[in-house]
From Swiss-Prot:
<feature type="disulfide bond">
    <location>
        <begin position="29"/>
        <end position="55"/>
    </location>
</feature>
<protein>
    <recommendedName>
        <fullName>Paralithocin 1</fullName>
    </recommendedName>
</protein>
<dbReference type="GO" id="GO:0031640">
    <property type="term" value="P:killing of cells of another organism"/>
</dbReference>
<keyword id="KW-0044">Antibiotic</keyword>
<keyword id="KW-1015">Disulfide bond</keyword>
<dbReference type="GO" id="GO:0050830">
    <property type="term" value="P:defense response to Gram-positive bacterium"/>
</dbReference>
<feature type="disulfide bond">
    <location>
        <begin position="37"/>
        <end position="49"/>
    </location>
</feature>
<keyword id="KW-0027">Amidation</keyword>
<feature type="signal peptide">
    <location>
        <begin position="1"/>
        <end position="23"/>
    </location>
</feature>
<feature type="modified residue" description="Tyrosine amide; partial">
    <location>
        <position position="61"/>
    </location>
</feature>
<feature type="disulfide bond">
    <location>
        <begin position="33"/>
        <end position="51"/>
    </location>
</feature>
<comment type="similarity">
    <text>Belongs to the paralithocin family.</text>
</comment>
<keyword id="KW-0732">Signal</keyword>
<comment type="function">
    <text>Has weak antibacterial activity, mainly against marine Gram-positive bacteria like C.maltaromaticum (MIC=200 uM), C.mobile (MIC=100 uM), C.divergens (MIC=200 uM) and C.funditum (MIC=200 uM) but also against C.glutamicum (MIC=50 uM). Has very little or no activity against Gram-negative bacteria.</text>
</comment>
<keyword id="KW-0929">Antimicrobial</keyword>
<feature type="disulfide bond">
    <location>
        <begin position="42"/>
        <end position="52"/>
    </location>
</feature>
Amino acid sequence: MGPMKVLLVLLVVMVAAPHIADAWQQPSCSSICDYSCGKSACISYSGRCGCCASCRRGPIYG
């Protein structure tokens, strides 16, 4: 493999890793919403948590 292909593989792994880790851990909804609701991070959990889904309707970033 050439150096460009190696870099491409590394990039894909780095982008995918957080999503894989998140799906694996499935943190509890209450802790996510306590710390993330009202922040942009909340949106990534909107499908999983009812409280973050309600936060999603009127997100306050920051």
